[in-house]
């Protein structure tokens, strides 16, 4: 075994140096973007310790908004300005709308059978159209209005019970429960709080494990076939990745099986029912046949991107409001003046139409705290130029939305939480304005914007209407430290003291 391993390593060494030599000759003839000096073998990996979006932000301040890195053997271009992002996501959208294939993306997308990680092509386009029609369209989002209202009612009842004890509550946990319960009912046709297959804590733990395993693996930085496999095997990354994937897949199998068994008695068919009908009827597209793997791929996208991101945005919004009493008071004054006393005790989504300042608070939260600070990486499908630099074909592109949202060239006092900056400001979060990219832009823009905004705005409205919020007595300052991988949450859970409004 030892001699075989030694032979394998001996074989890889000349291949490794040949690849480096060939790549250096080719790159020397191109006008690549600037970047930090690269070490042999590891490239710039040693400079990316800590939160990746902050490391890249700091490097971009020195090397510019279009920056070239080499992570191991894998070259990457990082974009950190609105102008460069517009060139990549609008001018060259078609040439930049594929995804790099990593070990995690291949496994979790079931070899490209999803809309998050799948490479660009006919199969991806048809699957995205299907997902939008059955779940993400404005009409579908409106049809789920009653679910969002019911789940917010349940959250408020729970908070009132906790508030009566006059002790701090873990608002992070409660808000995760809110967004999870909405997604479980709308997408999966199941209850989050009373799920027979997994308990609440297991679902949350599994999601965070999945998200941490979806990032680049160390083996992805050495894409030579034999070396990539060897690193993944020896480090145990392969084993951990497949272990998490199999647990997620088991959960989705339960969802599919439940829908098959309840098909005849289902009062309100959901997205899973609709896609299962197409599969049973052997729906055939020009380039592929719809399968259960496609369904589970879409379910995985909704599960991983729909629950965590909305909860994180609500958590950051509440943290910023408590830190900024002026903004909190202005938001609550608007809400309580416009809505008045609700005799039936329920907030309706129609109430949001009256609340312009609340919408500004959400915008400002998305600017300062995008739930996914780095947009999912894209891959160029042709040679292009961005800001005058050569970007070769099959080059990974990473857009730092966090950095763009804090760019002093676009935003006055960018570190300040100031919703008023959006008054009479045409910048929006729908992919048309490149100064604000929490959902991305172009062909790869997040299809769940309408669902996310409806969930966030209604949740925030309920929290601010029914309660006043204070810091726990023992805490003087709000800890705003970040933590995470694909998504970035508060490192310390948000604990606040809710006070029920006397007038209600």
Curated annotation (Swiss-Prot):
Pfam families: p450. GO terms for cellular component: membrane. Belongs to the cytochrome P450 family. It is a single-pass membrane protein. Keywords: Heme, Iron, Membrane, Metal-binding, Monooxygenase, Oxidoreductase, Transmembrane, Transmembrane helix. Its EC number is 1.14.-.-. PANTHER family: CYTOCHROME P450 71B11-RELATED (PTHR47956), CYTOCHROME P450 71B25-RELATED (PTHR47956:SF5). It is an enzyme of class 1 (oxidoreductase). This is Cytochrome P450 71B4. Its cofactor is heme. The chain crosses the membrane at residues 1-21. The keyword Ribonucleoprotein does not apply. It comes from the Eukaryota. Heme binds at residue 446. It is found in: Membrane. The keyword Transmembrane applies. It comes from Arabidopsis thaliana. One of its GO terms (molecular function) is iron ion binding. Signal peptide: none annotated. InterPro entries: Cyt_P450, Cyt_P450_CS, Cyt_P450_E_grp-I, Cyt_P450_sf, Cytochrome_P450_71. Its main location: membrane.
């Amino acid at each position: 075994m030892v001699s075989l391993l030694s032979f394998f390593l001996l074989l890889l060494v000349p291949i490794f140096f040949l690849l480096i030599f060939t790549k250096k000759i080719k790159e020397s003839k191109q006008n690549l973007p600037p970047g930090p000096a690269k070490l042999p073998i590891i490239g710039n990996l040693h400079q990316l310790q800590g939160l990746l979006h902050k490391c890249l932000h700091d490097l971009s301040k020195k090397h510019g908004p279009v920056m070239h890195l080499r992570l191991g053997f894998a070259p990457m271009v990082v974009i950190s300005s609105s102008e460069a992002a517009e060139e990549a996501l609008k001018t060259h959208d078609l040439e930049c709308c594929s995804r790099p294939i990593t070990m995690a993306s291949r496994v979790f997308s079931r070899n490209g059978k999803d809309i998050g990680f799948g490479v660009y092509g006919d199969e991806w386009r048809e699957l995205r159209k299907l997902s939008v029609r059955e779940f993400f369209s404005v009409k579908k989002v409106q049809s789920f209005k009653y679910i969002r209202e019911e789940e917010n009612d349940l959250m408020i009842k729970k908070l009132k019970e906790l508030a009566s004890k006059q002790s701090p509550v873990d608002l992070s946990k409660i808000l995760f429960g809110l967004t999870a319960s909405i997604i479980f009912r709308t997408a999966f046709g199941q209850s989050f709080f009373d799920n027979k297959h997994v308990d609440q804590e297991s679902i949350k733990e599994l999601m965070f494990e999945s998200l941490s395993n979806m990032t680049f693996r160390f083996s992805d930085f050495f894409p030579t076939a034999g070396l990539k496999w060897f690193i993944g095997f020896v480090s145990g990354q392969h084993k951990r990745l497949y272990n998490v994937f199999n647990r997620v897949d088991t959960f989705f199998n339960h969802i599919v099986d439940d829908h098959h068994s309840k098909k005849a008695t289902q009062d309100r068919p959901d997205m899973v029912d609709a896609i299962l009908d197409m599969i049973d009827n052997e729906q055939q597209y020009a380039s592929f046949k719809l399968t259960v793997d496609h369904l589970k791929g879409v379910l995985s996208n909704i599960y991983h991107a729909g629950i965590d991101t909305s909860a994180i945005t609500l958590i950051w919004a509440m943290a910023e409001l408590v830190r900024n009493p002026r903004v909190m008071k202005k938001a609550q004054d608007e809400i309580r003046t416009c809505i008045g006393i609700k005799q039936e005790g329920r907030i309706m989504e129609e109430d949001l139409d009256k609340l312009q300042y609340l919408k500004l608070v959400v915008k400002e939260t998305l600017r300062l705290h995008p739930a996914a600070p780095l947009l999912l990486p894209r891959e160029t499908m042709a040679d292009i130029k961005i800001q005058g630099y050569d970007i070769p074909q099959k080059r990974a592109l990473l857009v730092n939305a966090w950095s763009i949202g804090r760019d002093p060239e676009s935003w006055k006092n960018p570190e300040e939480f100031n919703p008023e900056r959006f008054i009479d400001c045409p910048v929006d979060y729908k992919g048309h304005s490149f100064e604000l990219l929490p959902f991305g832009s172009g062909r790869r823009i997040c299809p769940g914007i309408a669902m996310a905004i409806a969930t966030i705005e209604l949740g925030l409205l309920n929290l601010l209407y029914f309660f006043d919020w204070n810091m726990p007595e023992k805490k003087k300052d709000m800890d705003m430290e970040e933590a995470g991988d694909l998504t970035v949450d508060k490192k310390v859970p948000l604990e606040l003291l809710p006070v029920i409004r006397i007038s209600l």
